[in-house]
Structure formats: structure tokens, C-alpha cells
Amino acid sequence: MYRVPLLILIVALSLAPSRAADRKPIRFWNLTLHTVVSLQLSPAGQQAWGRDQCENDRDHEVDHDERLRITDVVPGRYDIRLKDKTGRVCVVKNVDVTDGAVFSIEEKDLSGCGG
């Protein structure tokens, strides 16, 4: 007697999309002058750098004017550490990362870079 409603409930739940699947991707847009070879995010002010997001790209680098899908990051404010092909390492502080949106870093955003 309870088997049919239970079966219907199980099927309905398995077909319902998960919230994670509904989320639109976060993307980084490289507007610097050089190809980015490493990109890490840390919650703003914490220096707790996450994994290299360039691993998400087919060739593991983000050319000028290319976009990169960001994974395993929740929306919030982040410091972004990037390394480009010239060997320059830069940190851009307090970047707003929004679900389903693109955040960009331009050459003018880069200061205090080391190499």
C-alpha cells in the first residue's frame, strides 16, 4: 500500500535538479597584458590560498581576453593571487566574486607585483 507513493517520491526526488546544478558558473576574465599561468583565491585578508584554478583550463593557462571557469568557490570577497608567463606574481585584494557572474582583472588592477 505504501510502496507506490514511496516509489513515486523516490523517483521525483531523483529527477529534481540539485541546487549546485542550478548555480551558474563563476568566471574569471583575464584583461591583463599577459597570459596567466596560476590563479588562486583566498577569502579576503586570510592568505589561505586555494588550489590553482588554471587547472580548470584545457591548456592550464588563461590568455589575454580569455575567460576561465572558477570551481569549488562560494560567492564572497576574495584576494586573488596570479602568476603570469613573465614570472610576475601579483595579489589583487578584495575582489567581489558573485554567483553566475564574471569578475575581471585588468592591468591597472595589478600593483605590488613581484617577480
Segments from the language model and where they lie:
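Intrinsically disordered, low-complexity Pro/Gly/Ser/Thr-rich segments with frequent PxxP/GP/PP motifs
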Residues: 49-74
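A short tyrosine-centered beta-strand micro-motif
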Residues: 78-80
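Structural beta-strand segments of beta-rich domains
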Residues: 22-26, 66
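Asparagine-centered strand-capping/turn motif at beta-strand->loop junctions
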Residues: 27-34, 43
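Sec-dependent signal peptide recognition
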Residues: 2-8
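Structured interaction patches on ligand/partner-binding surfaces of diverse proteins
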Residues: 21, 83-114
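Hydrophobic h-region of N-terminal signal peptides that target proteins for export
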Residues: 9-18
